[in-house]
Amino acid sequence: MKRSHYFIAVPLTSEAKQAISRFSGDASSSLPFRTWVHEEDYHITLAFLGDVPPGKMAPLCEAMAAVAAKSAPFSLALAGLGTFGERTAPRIFWQGVKEEAALNELRRDVYEACLSLGFSLDRRPFAPHITIARKWQGEAPFQPEALRSLPAASTVFSVPEIVLYRTNMEKTPKYETIAAFPLLGAPDGRTGEGMGQLLKLRDYISRYETDVYHYVPEFIRLKQWQWEQAKARWEAERDADGARREPGETWDFLLDKPSWWERLIGRWRRGPEPEMDEERSPAPSLSRAATLDELKWQFLDDLFELQGMPAGRL
């Protein structure tokens, strides 16, 4: 059975991808590399994991969510070109980024978290780059000096999240988003910013789609963990601000969350329920996929409730 490879990376914005793609299109006519990377596959690798057994998926996602929760969003600037491999026959042609302390710190935290989970990682020093082409196949040796005359892409882009990708070698583009983790830290070093950060989770929750469904119990536990972390941050900030919590506030309904999650896991494990007429069973029967959709929308509805807004599905 063919195993999938996974990695944690910084994604690029559409604008940054387009800038590199335009450069790539121009450069490919004069630089005979065998493969030019698809625009949607541009990224900055933080940790290459290789295979991720099902039992490690939930701990990995929890660890990445924790790292992201304490990291503040930042910006990067495209700058410079370079190669890896032999000087005259490089195996990688890359676009660089300007030195950024926030990126180095994020990579350090991601790397250490992955090591603590037992992943075997590349020990070489971190060299942030975006691979744009592979394998020199020119008849003449590659001339590094030629890069100086190329009009490299130049733009600044935001980094609001880190992503767990899976490699699909038989597809184009070949890197598939498995989970995205929003950077929720505040610039002053605090973890989270109360409701504003909670609402960010609403914007990202729809990212947890297709392939995470293969690890449904782990996925459900991850959602429970994220909810508990967000709730704890919000309550801590409420307490720090000296706000008085009235009985019956919106947090009260969260006390039943553990039993709700357990019921949902149980329903998923039982599989599709038999069809019944409306008189015998007013509640709709749910397939496993429908139950997972319920999970996603329930999480969204909970966030809407915390805002004091009617529940709604975006």
Curated annotation (Swiss-Prot):
InterPro entries xrefs: Cyclic_Pdiesterase, Phosphoesterase_HXTX, RNA_CPDase
Motif HXTX 2 mapped to chain: 129-132
Alphabetical UniProt keywords: Hydrolase
Active-site residues from the entry: H43 (proton donor), H129 (proton acceptor)
Motif HXTX 1: where in chain: 43-46
EC number(s) stated in the UniProt entry for this protein: 3.1.4.58
Coiled coil start-end: none
Reaction catalyzed: a 3'-end 2',3'-cyclophospho-ribonucleotide-RNA + H2O = a 3'-end 2'-phospho-ribonucleotide-RNA + H(+)
GO molecular function, one term: 2',3'-cyclic-nucleotide 3'-phosphodiesterase activity
Family: Belongs to the 2H phosphoesterase superfamily. ThpR family.
Described purpose of this protein according to its UniProt entry: Hydrolyzes RNA 2',3'-cyclic phosphodiester to an RNA 2'-phosphomonoester.
Protein name: RNA 2',3'-cyclic phosphodiesterase
Origin species: Geobacillus stearothermophilus (Bacillus stearothermophilus)
